[in-house]
Amino acid sequence: MPKEQQEVVVLGSPHISTSATATTINMPEISTPDHVVWSLFNTLFMNFCCLGFVAYAYSVKSRDRKMVGDTTGAQAFASTAKCLNISSLFFTILTAIVVIVVCAIR
């Protein structure tokens, strides 16, 4: 089979050849939440038995692991931080309810 060559004519201004520069950005496929904001909130306002502070420490470790590229480690630290945040929130709300009930009974 003979190869056909086609010519394309562009109307308008003359064509100036320039070299094109390509930039590639490697983006991570999965974004792992590190729960830093939630941990900071729990540290400042709902720090039941220092659970908020420990959750903040695990959140920072998760963020560090994510920056290094260790997604498995980041997910493990983020999961621990999430559990600690939920525990801190639950126990702080439970303590507040108990205090309100005890004060209301007196």
UniProtKB/Swiss-Prot annotation:
Residues in the Cytoplasmic compartment per record: 1-35, 57-84
Organ and tissue specificity: Predominantly expressed in nascent primordial germ cells, as well as in gonadal germ cells.
Lipidation residue positions, type S-palmitoyl cysteine: 49-50, 83
InterPro entries: CD225/Dispanin_fam, IFITM_antiviral_protein
Annotated function: IFN-induced antiviral protein which inhibits the entry of viruses to the host cell cytoplasm, permitting endocytosis, but preventing subsequent viral fusion and release of viral contents into the cytosol. Active against multiple viruses, including influenza A virus, SARS coronavirus (SARS-CoV), Marburg virus (MARV), Ebola virus (EBOV), Dengue virus (DNV) and West Nile virus (WNV). Can inhibit: influenza virus hemagglutinin protein-mediated viral entry, MARV and EBOV GP1,2-mediated viral entry and SARS-CoV S protein-mediated viral entry.
Intramembrane segments: 36-56
Topology relative to the membrane: Single-pass membrane protein
Protein localization: Cell membrane; Lysosome membrane
Post-translational modifications reported in the UniProt record: Palmitoylation on membrane-proximal cysteines controls clustering in membrane compartments and antiviral activity.
Protein name, entry field: Interferon-induced transmembrane protein 1
Sequence intervals crossing the membrane: 85-105
Top-level division of the source organism's lineage: Eukaryota
Alphabetic keyword roster: Antiviral defense, Cell membrane, Immunity, Innate immunity, Lipoprotein, Lysosome, Membrane, Osteogenesis, Palmitate, Transmembrane, Transmembrane helix
GO cellular component: early endosome; lysosomal membrane; plasma membrane; protein-containing complex
Family (UniProt): Belongs to the CD225/Dispanin family.
Extracellular topological domain: 106
PANTHER family to which the protein is assigned, alphabetical: INTERFERON INDUCED TRANSMEMBRANE PROTEIN 7-RELATED, INTERFERON INDUCIBLE TRANSMEMBRANE PROTEIN
Binding partners and assembly: Interacts with CD81. Part of a complex composed of CD19, CR2/CD21, CD81 and IFITM1/CD225 in the membrane of mature B-cells. Interacts with CAV1; this interaction enhances the ability of CAV1 in inhibiting ERK activation.
